Regions:
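Gly/Ser-rich "nucleophile elbow"/oxyanion-hole loop immediately N-terminal to the catalytic nucleophile
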Residues: 1-19
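Flexible "cap/lid" loop of the alpha/beta hydrolase fold
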Residues: 45-62
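Short glycine-enriched nucleophile-adjacent loop
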Residues: 22-33
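Short, proline-enriched alpha-helix->beta-strand connector loops that line the catalytic pocket
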Residues: 64-70
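Catalytic nucleophile serine of serine hydrolases
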Residues: 19-20, 43
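Active-site nucleophile loop of the alpha/beta-hydrolase fold
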Residues: 40-48, 76-78
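Residue in the alpha/beta-hydrolase core beta-strand immediately N-terminal to the catalytic nucleophile
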Residues: 14, 38-40
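C-terminal catalytic histidine-bearing segment of alpha/beta-hydrolase fold enzymes
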Residues: 73, 82-130
Length: 130
């Protein structure tokens, strides 16, 4: 639908989601990674359904055909000093994936909602590097 009305460069696409949208972003990352080159999951609800997304990740061996970037962020307050954080656990399970660059941002003093804006800022920085 968007492609019908706007020019889309299919080699430069980013999927962004926050909270449950961040969980959706991780789902697409795991199951349809060829559709986007960049994935930004801000404060993803990894805990949902008894950490189902982590279980799904552990069952897969992911290697990427093209260079792919995954950006994960979480607010310090919402993380409740959990060590490692859910996003760090997610990233650790991907450490041996080929053609994948992972960035993690722990946002100091930020709650779940407050963590949204610094993550959006990263999307704009990512897009401006092109």
């Amino acid at each position: 639908m968007i492609e019908e009305n706007y020019h889309i460069n299919k080699q430069k696409q980013t999927l962004f989601g926050h909270s449950y949208g961040g969980l959706f972003t991780l789902y697409v990352f795991l199951n349809h990674s060829e559709d986007f080159q960049n994935f930004v999951a801000a404060s993803p609800s990894i805990w949902w359904n008894d950490y189902y997304i982590l279980k799904e990740l552990k069952e897969k061996k992911l290697d990427f055909k093209i260079n792919t970037k995954l950006f994960l962020s979480v607010g310090e307050v919402e993380n409740k000093n959990k060590v490692p954080s859910d996003i760090e656990t997610f990233a650790t399970n991907l450490r041996n994936s080929k053609n994948l660059e992972i960035s993690i941002l722990n946002i100091s003093g930020a709650s779940h909602i407050e963590a949204l804006y610094p993550a959006l800022n990263q999307v704009f920085k990512l897009e401006n590097k092109r």
